[in-house]
Amino acid sequence: MLKFDIQHFAHKKGGGSTSNGRDSESKRLGAKRADGQFVTGGSILYRQRGTKIYPGTNVGRGGDDTLFAKTDGVVRFERMGRDKKKVSVYPEVQEA
C-alpha cells in the first residue's frame, strides 16, 4: 500500500503589515488677519502653539496661545527687538 505525504503551502504569501498609512489633521495655525486690516473686538488675529508672536496693545492671549483683539481697531504686526514680534490693535482716531 502506498502512502502519500501531502503538504499544502500558500501559493500567495501574506500581505504583511506596515507602520505607515496615517497622518494627523492639520490645525490651521497662522495669521487670520493681515497688517492694516480693521477688526472688531474678539476677532482672532493669530493662531499658534507657544508664543511665536507676543500680544501687544489691545491684544489678549487665550489658553491655547491664540491672539485676539480686545477692542475694535486696525491690526499692526510689529517687531520687539531683533528676534521677537508682537501684534497690536490700535483704535481708529475719530476726527471732529
UniProtKB/Swiss-Prot annotation:
In terms of InterPro entries, this protein maps to: Ribosomal_bL27 (IPR001684), Ribosomal_bL27_CS (IPR018261)
Does the record bear Ribosomal protein in its keywords? Answer: yes
Q: Which GO terms describe its cellular component?
A: cytosolic large ribosomal subunit
Q: Does the keyword Ribosomal protein apply?
A: yes
Q: Which residues form the propeptide?
A: 1-9
PROSITE patterns (UniProt xref): RIBOSOMAL_L27 (PS00831)
Note the Pfam families from the entry: Ribosomal_L27
> What keywords are assigned to this protein?
Ribonucleoprotein, Ribosomal protein
What GO molecular functions are on record for this protein?
structural constituent of ribosome
Family (UniProt)? Belongs to the bacterial ribosomal protein bL27 family.
Query: HAMAP family this protein is in?
Result: Ribosomal_bL27 (MF_00539)
In its UniProt entry, what is this protein called?
Large ribosomal subunit protein bL27
